[in-house]
Design a protein with these regions (language model features):
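Conserved PLP-enzyme active-site core in the AAT-like
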Residues: 5-214, 219
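Conserved PLP-binding active-site segment in aminotransferase class I/II-type PLP enzymes
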Residues: 1-3
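Conserved small-domain helix->loop->beta segment predominantly found in fold-type I
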Residues: 203-254
């Protein structure tokens, strides 16, 4: 899966996959760093359950690697990454973020739902094997495709991390039904075609909206002027793919 050797795909949802990663890799007294545009339920989990269990957190600017570097300290045991960010779709310099985490000895976990393993390879970001430690994915979205299945995955190349994740997965009692598995497996062969079709349609609509007088800004990583566009181009240029998600900012008068 996504070029990784070890995978846990029996997650009942994408959020369950996120929770499994945080619960497996953090303990009381640790600190986790999260981008300020992270998936909302991940923030809620961090501010709620994790905080109650003595795990602190800081939010960092995903477009400023120096800000992330300044926040890493001796208590930092996990850095969450998102490319692109949730809702506002800023695209970070993911390569430099991962280089920083590895240089500082901090585990980094990517929410790779947006890229779906197609826009870029999270385990080979630079063509030379630089990759995240763990990639989580809401299979509910693009892999399922039908909107009728909840499922998630956690993927790693690290055997020690895989064991931690596997034990947490077992202790939390995560499981999924065989019918849901069948539905996702049936949809996987068409995933590349569907993802590309979503991308084409979204870009066409985004460009149309960009010319509307009501629209102040279109937030789409593949469009020039969108925050982090250069980072998207550097990372996803070989595939020229982007998900079918974008946001718009309306002028106040509208």
């Amino acid at each position: 899966v996504f070029g990784a050797f070890l995978a846990l795909t029996q997650m009942p949802s994408g959020l369950a996959a996120v929770a499994c990663a945080s619960l497996a890799l953090l303990k009381s007294g640790d600190e986790v760093l999260i981008p300020d545009n992270a998936y909302g339920p991940n923030k809620a989990l961090t501010e709620g359950e994790l905080a109650a269990w003595g795990i602190t957190h800081q939010y960092y600017d995903p477009l400023d690697v120096a800000d992330l570097a300044a926040r890493i300290n001796e208590r930092t045991h996990l850095v969450w990454l998102e490319a692109a960010g949730s809702i506002t779709l800023e695209f970070p310099d993911l390569i430099e973020q991962v280089r920083l985490c590895r240089a500082r000895g901090v585990t980094c976990v990517l929410d790779n739902t947006w890229g779906a393993g197609l826009a870029f390879n999270p385990f080979d970001l630079d063509g030379q094997g630089l990759g995240v430690h763990v990639s989580v994915h809401a299979l509910t979205k693009y892999p399922s495709g039908g909107g009728d299945v909840l499922m998630g995955s956690v993927v790693t190349r690290d055997a020690a991390l895989h064991l931690k994740l596997k034990l947490t997965h077992m202790r939390m009692g995560y499981g999924i039904g065989v019918n849901d598995v069948e539905a996702v497996l049936r949809s996987l062969p068409s995933l590349p075609l569907r993802y590309a079709a979503h991308d084409r349609a979204a870009r066409e609509l985004a460009r149309w909206l960009a010319d509307r007088e009501e629209v102040a800004q279109v937030l789409h990583p593949a469009l020039e002027g969108s925050p982090g566009h250069a980072h998207w181009k550097a990372l996803c240029g070989p595939t020229d793919l982007a998900a079918g998600l974008f946001s718009i900012v309306l002028h106040e008068r509208h």
